[in-house]
């Protein structure tokens, strides 16, 4: 009789954790994360609560101080004269500090506003007779003249030069005698010219007026004015065709500009 023997198959080794262990680890992880979040929230709450309590304590101390100060002024309570004097001194120092801080803030704000504002730039000059009878009119700082800032200057008595760029209102008024010979038909022309810091001169405004045939001096005025953007170092001047006809009395002929 032949007996057969079969060797039992080896037991399979478990490669993963049991299901109960996985559930335990998952719950432990959730618990730790929840505890960390709760700790952070509690710390934030505690910090804010402590700040609020500290503020309330300070307010309470201020209230007690003011209440004691009132008692000192009324002569009530058991506070000694020395304590009252000390409290009054502290209160006066506090008021003085608050007043000084307000004044410093006002001064700083005023200085900042002054620094932000553009300085006023304005000029107004009157005509002056020129023996050379040149076509470019001469001007002078006399009579009712204005030279508001050192950022504008009258150069060579002929042109106004600005040292800061910006928009300017430039104007001129020229009064002249309109009597001419009947045979001459040439009008009296006034031109407002720009001389940039670099480049050639160019005309900004021009106006013309006809002459009369009268032998008497019939006064006529030409007014020019406009807004122009001038660069730093630019100059403006006035040119006429007959400088000998210009009237130079006060108030008749003038020239100026104003920064907008």
Swiss-Prot record:
The way this protein sits in the membrane is described as:
Single-pass type II membrane protein
Do you know which InterPro entries this protein is assigned to? Answer: CD40L, TNF_CS, TNF_dom, Tumour_necrosis_fac-like_dom
This chain is glycosylated at 239
Q: Which residue positions does UniProt flag as site: Cleavage?
A: 111-112
Family annotation (CDD domains)? TNF
Q: In which tissues is it expressed?
A: Specifically expressed on activated CD4+ T-lymphocytes.
- Does the keyword field hold Cell membrane? yes
What ranges are annotated Cytoplasmic (topological domains)? 1-22
Q: Name one GO biological process term.
A: inflammatory response
Q: What subcellular locations does the record give?
A: Cell membrane; Cell surface
Chain ranges of the THD domain? 121-260
Q: Name one Pfam family in it.
A: TNF
PTM comment text: The soluble form derives from the membrane form by proteolytic processing.
Sequence ranges on the Extracellular membrane side: 47-260
The molecular function GO annotations come to: CD40 receptor binding; cytokine activity; integrin binding; protein serine/threonine kinase activator activity; tumor necrosis factor receptor binding
One GO CC term on file? external side of plasma membrane
Which controlled-vocabulary keywords does the entry list? Cell membrane, Cytokine, Disulfide bond, Glycoprotein, Membrane, Secreted, Signal-anchor, Transmembrane, Transmembrane helix
Task: Report the transmembrane regions from the record.
Answer: 23-46
Summarize the protein's role: Cytokine that acts as a ligand to CD40/TNFRSF5. Costimulates T-cell proliferation and cytokine production. Its cross-linking on T-cells generates a costimulatory signal which enhances the production of IL4 and IL10 in conjunction with the TCR/CD3 ligation and CD28 costimulation. Induces the activation of NF-kappa-B. Induces the activation of kinases MAPK8 and PAK2 in T-cells. Mediates B-cell proliferation in the absence of co-stimulus as well as IgE production in the presence of IL4. Involved in immunoglobulin class switching.
Subunit note: Homotrimer. Interacts with CD28. CD40 ligand, soluble form: Exists as either a monomer or a homotrimer. Forms a ternary complex between CD40 and integrins for CD40-CD40LG signaling.
Q: Which family does it belong to?
A: Belongs to the tumor necrosis factor family.
Spell out the protein name for this chain.
CD40 ligand
The organism encoding this protein is Mus musculus (Mouse)
Q: Which gene encodes it?
A: Cd40lg
């Amino acid at each position: 009789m032949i007996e057969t023997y079969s060797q039992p198959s080896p037991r399979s080794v478990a490669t993963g954790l049991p299901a109960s262990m996985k559930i335990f680890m998952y719950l432990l992880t959730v618990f730790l994360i929840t505890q960390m979040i709760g700790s952070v929230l509690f710390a934030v709450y505690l910090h804010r609560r402590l700040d609020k309590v500290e503020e309330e304590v300070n307010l309470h101390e201020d209230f007690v101080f003011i209440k004691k100060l009132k008692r000192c002024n009324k002569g009530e309570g058991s506070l000694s004269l020395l304590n009252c004097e000390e409290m009054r001194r502290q209160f006066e120092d506090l008021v003085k500090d608050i007043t000084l801080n307000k004044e410093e803030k006002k001064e700083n704000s005023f200085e900042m506003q002054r620094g932000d504002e553009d300085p006023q730039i304005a000029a107004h000059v009157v005509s002056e007779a020129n023996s050379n009878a040149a076509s470019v009119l001469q001007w002078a700082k006399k009579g009712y003249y204005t030279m508001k800032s050192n950022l504008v200057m009258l150069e060579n008595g002929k042109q106004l030069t600005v040292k800061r760029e910006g928009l300017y209102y430039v104007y001129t008024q020229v009064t002249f005698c309109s009597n001419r010979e009947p045979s001459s038909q040439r009008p009296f022309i006034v031109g407002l010219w720009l001389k940039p810091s670099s480049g050639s001169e160019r005309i900004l405004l021009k106006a013309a007026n006809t002459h009369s045939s009268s032998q008497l001096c019939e006064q006529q005025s030409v007014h020019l004015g406009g807004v122009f953007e001038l660069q730093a170092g630019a100059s403006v001047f006035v040119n006429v065709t007959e400088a000998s006809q210009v009237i130079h009395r006060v108030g008749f002929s003038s020239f100026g500009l104003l920064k907008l």
